[in-house]
């Protein structure tokens, strides 16, 4: 059985996207065309709170910052799964409880592995 798709219902969404995109492009273009363009060395220099720049703004970051960021995202997503599970725990019963405990055990094993490998050590 085929479900009839009424494309006319999506017309307001299409108009919203077209008008929003057109307005954004128009405003950026008008600012680029009419705005003054007088670059000099002071305008192109990186700004550091009113002080003279101590070093080049394009310095390299340590890889450990990226590792901490990735670990934060992973465990933040775990928390995002825990909140709805806690709210719906009475409705999903034992199968939902057991599946979430397996999920948490996998994350706990991953955390222990990261800790044992020294991924959380900063020295």
UniProtKB/Swiss-Prot annotation:
Signal peptide: none annotated. It catalyses: a quinone + NADH + 5 H(+)(in) = a quinol + NAD(+) + 4 H(+)(out). GO terms for cellular component: NADH dehydrogenase complex; plasma membrane. Keywords: Cell inner membrane, Cell membrane, Membrane, NAD, Quinone, Translocase, Transmembrane, Transmembrane helix, Transport, Ubiquinone. Pfam families: Oxidored_q4. One of its GO terms (molecular function) is NADH:ubiquinone reductase (non-electrogenic) activity. It is an enzyme of class 7 (translocase). The keyword Cell inner membrane applies. It comes from the Bacteria. Its main location: membrane. Its EC number is 7.1.1.-. The chain crosses the membrane at residues 11-31, 67-87, 92-112. The keyword Cell membrane applies. It is found in: Cell inner membrane. It is a multi-pass membrane protein. Belongs to the complex I subunit 3 family. NDH-1 is composed of 14 different subunits. Subunits NuoA, H, J, K, L, M, N constitute the membrane sector of the complex. NDH-1 shuttles electrons from NADH, via FMN and iron-sulfur (Fe-S) centers, to quinones in the respiratory chain. The immediate electron acceptor for the enzyme in this species is believed to be ubiquinone. Couples the redox reaction to proton translocation (for every two electrons transferred, four hydrogen ions are translocated across the cytoplasmic membrane), and thus conserves the redox energy in a proton gradient. This is NADH-quinone oxidoreductase subunit A. It comes from Paraburkholderia phymatum (strain DSM 17167 / CIP 108236 / LMG 21445 / STM815) (Burkholderia phymatum).
């Amino acid at each position: 059985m085929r479900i009839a798709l009424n494309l006319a219902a999506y017309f307001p969404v299409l108009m919203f996207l077209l008008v929003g995109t057109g307005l954004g492009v128009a405003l950026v273009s008008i600012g680029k065309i009419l705005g003054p363009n007088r670059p000099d060395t002071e305008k192109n220099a990186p700004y550091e709170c009113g002080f003279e720049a101590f070093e080049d703004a394009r310095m390299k970051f340590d890889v450990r910052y990226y590792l901490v960021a990735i670990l934060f995202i992973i465990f933040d997503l775990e928390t995002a799964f825990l909140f709805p599970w806690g709210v719906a725990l009475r409705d999903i019963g034992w199968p939902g409880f057991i599946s979430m405990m397996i999920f948490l055990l996998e994350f706990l094993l991953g955390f222990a592995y990261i800790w044992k490998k020294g991924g959380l050590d900063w020295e």
